[in-house]
């Protein structure tokens, strides 16, 4: 049975990430930077984890904390720092996540565990998931949309792992149309 009970918000034609990457996918896209018009509707973006209450609901929805746990403004700020570090990894920026230390477990079931409890432990669990996904290669399929007016993080499910846009139907089409018009205009 799945531990995840939320709803994944995918772009049309977007591949579903592996289940263990879904919380990371949603964390990175909780900061929506889209600023284009699609079907007459302006995408305005926003931050869906801006308050302690929103963060508490999101973490509890992913079974990372108990629904009765206390979440503070500093927890929101720490979550934003983790999200920023993860999103910046797609632009070639390397960030050290010293704030979320992990413990290596060498036992019958080896793994990585957060060194803290509560919200910090939940964020450490997300950081550990990134480390494990890097080790198994699935993190390499997480990408940031190449469209400058989008920056949505997506899972590249293409056979050759060469996807550039979160959706070929929207962002890919817009980018290719712009390039065509630019070439036609410039001769």
Per-segment meaning from a language model:
Residues 169-187:
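Basic DNA-binding region of bZIP-type proteins
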Residues 1-144, 148-155:
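Short helix-coil boundary/hinge micro-motifs
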